[in-house]
Curated annotation (Swiss-Prot):
It comes from Rhodopseudomonas palustris (strain TIE-1). This is Polyribonucleotide nucleotidyltransferase. Residues 697-722 are annotated as: Disordered. Keywords: Cytoplasm, Magnesium, Metal-binding, Nucleotidyltransferase, RNA-binding, Transferase. Belongs to the polyribonucleotide nucleotidyltransferase family. The keyword Ribosomal protein does not apply. Residues 554-613 form the KH domain.
Length: 722
């Protein structure tokens, strides 16, 4: 019934198995990949004919995690998986980025890659396995894919690189780096690092590239057994059109790309394009070519002219040389009521970044395959259409916004203070108000400034820079702080963030083969110079965290109570803690280990809440004096609430010095009194005294009364002796 083919290798000390022919047989390509006991299914389906009216690759990649893979039932009312989580979106992008450049030029058939996690062993993260499975499924599918690719995760523990560290090891690593590529080229890098050097980062990339070669070999072995016949792809020769167009518009296009202002440049390029279209589509004549084809050739010509200019003259679109960073202006404290804010402007790219400090109530609960955990640092990136002078629909967060936000998150996360030292939930929002390249790195710079403006004690200021590359044969140019056009028309997008000490995040997307280790080394070195320059410009606004939190930020005090007292502080159904919050105005969060966090923007509220909680959580001490309230008057004495929720009895004989006829002669309900804890009777009832305490000053009179009594006893004895 099944025509099963499989390959198995040992990879990083665990078995990796790729199998096809048993599951999802109606897909063009389907591979079940197993690593340890983590299992994913990758499928590829491509439409039989090209999609009409498009001049791009219509590829969609979806990665999905099923709760059953970890033996869990989804939360929520419907108890089924809902919209993609942040992790699913990020892994979808992780798969997409290295495979997209490898589709043959001109492939316009709708192509969908779906990767589903079927089993998770809580040791091996499914993301790298998903990339491998998708590569294998594409290689088998028959679509024109110039793969396969391999992928690997690299850690750095005890000064050594570790291949595919298990989840438990990730807590110890100084580096989490995912790298993907072909047999002879690196195509994609995504990473977070604890201020590591350029040499260590480059070494990790090359280590990963070497160690996923056996995976590529295994996919090729499987393809030799089970690959489908390659799809036919008609390659159209546009050389004659390009030659004609070059003679028509080359000089005007070169002049347009010498205009430094983005909007003016786009307008000039638009006019040149109109001229080309008018030439190839004269009015009243039957057109010889399809409009999309002409537009595609024009786009290719744009890229060539920009690239030629840079390589021939060393000058870029806006007149800079390859190493110069655009003009920078950094400002902090730009919004009056926020906890921290910054406006970071670099050329025609601008980010307004705002930091908000919250409490434990504001932590994000993340439901993942490995369980639910709390996230205390959030960074959100928004890219409204006005930032590029366009109109557009505002709706849900797009994949690109999630990806850019996570990149900035990775850049900042390593320099944040430990949560036990700075127990705030931190949310940073980057609003991109202008964009002409490198908006994610502007978000990193703005986030660092906004956090320091809010008083968050970062280890060091952090900055980011986007690098580009133009490669033609033996000639190449590495570009610092790229423009949007240089990003689109170049061969590499290379984003580096970090401090003066080292790199905290590295993201790389390479569109062509042939980028050597030496070129990457040059790019990293040039990026370091640019990063140090940007940090210097940022320091003109703020070079360290403010000594005090923002005026409107909450203050948090942390202390511990015995775990057996947590129930008393919370009360039945949360009654006690709700009363504390309502009456003091402070927010209270109690963790399972007895850690209590009390937060408020008002210091008196915090003091009141702490005093209340401590009075409940600790036991009163015999001999201590407390202030209390008379809650009930009886014939034999008065009950006084004196220690949180604790009441005690002041017997009538302990109300006042001398004989008391009626309790009500001395106290009534609601009176504020000072009492001394005498002890506990045989039944554990609390015994209090008022008469041994000065009700005005709170002074302990018992010692004084004993001294007086002793003195009175000695006087008659002396008289008798005389």
């Amino acid at each position: 019934m099944f025509n099963i083919h499989s390959v198995e290798i040992d990879w990083g000390g665990r078995p990796l198995k790729l199998e096809t022919g048993k599951v999802a047989r109606q897909a063009d390509g389907a591979v079940v990949a197993t690593y340890g006991e983590t299992v994913v299914l990758a499928t590829v389906v491509a439409a039989k004919s090209p999609r009409e009216g498009v001049d791009f690759l219509p590829l969609t990649v979806d990665y999905q995690e099923k709760a059953y893979a970890a033996g869990r039932i989804p939360g929520g009312y419907f108890k089924r998986e809902g919209r993609p989580t942040e992790k699913e979106t990020l892994v979808s992008r992780l798969i997409d980025r290295p495979i997209r450049p490898l589709f043959a030029d001109g492939w316009r058939n709708e192509t969908q890659v779906i990767v589903t996690v079927l089993s998770h062993d809580m040791e091996n993260d499914p993301d790298v396995l998903a990339m491998v499975a998708a590569s294998a499924a594409l290689t088998l599918s028959g679509v024109p894919f110039k793969g396969p690719i391999g992928a690997a995760r690299v850690g750095f523990i005890n000064d050594e690189y570790v291949l595919n560290p298990v989840l438990d090891e990730m807590a110890e690593t100084q580096l989490e780096l995912v790298v993907a590529g072909t047999a002879d080229a690196v195509l994609m890098v995504e990473s977070e690092a604890k201020e590591l050097s350029e040499e260590i980062m480059l070494g990790a990339v090359m280590f990963g590239h070497r160690h996923f070669q056996p995976v590529i070999d295994a996919i090729i072995d499987l393809a030799e057994k089970a690959a489908k016949e390659p799809r036919e792809l008609t390659v159209v020769d546009d050389s004659e059109i390009e030659k004609e167009m070059l003679g028509l518009v080359e000089q005007e296009l070169r002049a347009a790309y010498a205009i430094p202002v983005k909007q003016d440049r786009y307008a000039a390029v638009g006019k040149v394009k109109e001229k080309a279209i008018a030439h190839f589509f004269p009015e009243g004549q039957e057109p010889k070519y399809d409009k999309l084809r002409i537009a595609g050739v024009f786009k290719e010509l744009e890229a060539k002219i920009v690239r030629w200019n840079i390589l021939d003259t060393g000058k870029r679109i806006d007149g800079r040389d390859s190493k110069t960073v655009r003009n920078i202006l950094a400002q902090v404290g730009v919004l009056p009521r926020t906890h921290g804010s910054a406006l970071f402007t670099r050329g025609e790219t601008q980010a307004l970044v705002v930091t908000t400090l919250g409490t434990g109530e504001d932590e994000q609960y993340v439901d993942s395959l490995s369980g639910t955990y709390k996230e205390t640092f959030l960074l959100h990136y928004n890219f409204p259409p006005y930032s590029v002078g366009e109109t557009g629909r505002l709706g849900g967060t797009k994949r690109r916004e999630i990806g850019h936000g996570k990149l900035a998150w990775r850049a900042i996360h390593p320099v944040l203070p430990p949560h036990h030292e700075f127990p705030y939930t931190i949310r940073v929002v980057s609003e991109i108000t202008e964009s002409n390249g490198s908006s994610s790195m502007a978000s990193v710079c703005g986030a660092s400034l906004a956090l320091m403006d809010a008083g968050v004690p970062l280890k060091r200021p952090t900055a980011g820079i986007a690098m580009g590359l133009i490669l033609e044969g033996e000639r190449f140019a590495v570009l610092s702080d790229i423009l949007g056009d240089e990003d689109h028309l170049g061969d590499m997008d290379f984003k580096v963030a970090g401090t003066e000490q080292g790199i905290t995040s590295l993201q790389m997307d390479i569109k062509i083969a042939g980028i050597t280790e030496e070129i990457m080394k040059v790019a990293l070195g040039q990026a370091k110079d640019g990063r140090i320059h940007i940090l210097g410009e940022m320091s003109k606004a703020l070079d360290r965290a403010r000594a005090e939190l923002g005026e409107h930020a909450p203050r948090i005090e942390t202390f511990k109570i015995p775990t057996d007292k947590i129930r008393e502080v919370i009360g039945t159904g949360g009654k006690v803690i709700r009363e504390i919050v309502e009456k003091t105005g402070a927010k209270v969060n109690i963790e399972d280990d007895g850690t209590v966090k009390v937060a408020s923007s008002d210091g008196e509220s915090i003091k009141a809440a702490i005093k209340w909680i401590k009075s409940i959580a600790s036991d009163p001490e015999i001999g201590e004096i407390y202030e209390g309230t008379v809650v009930k008057v009886m014939e034999f004495g008065a009950f006084v609430n004196f220690f949180g929720a604790k009441d005690g009895l002041v017997h009538i004989s302990q109300l006042a010095a001398g004989r008391v006829q009626k309790t009500s002669d001395v106290v009534k309900e609601g009176d504020k009194v000072k009492v001394k804890l005498l002890g506990f009777d045989d039944r554990g009832k609390t015994r209090l005294s008022m008469k041994v305490v000065d009700q005005t000053t709170g002074e302990d009179l018992e010692a004084k009364q004993k001294a007086e009594a002793k003195a009175e006893g000695e006087a008659p004895a002396q008289a008798a002796g005389e």
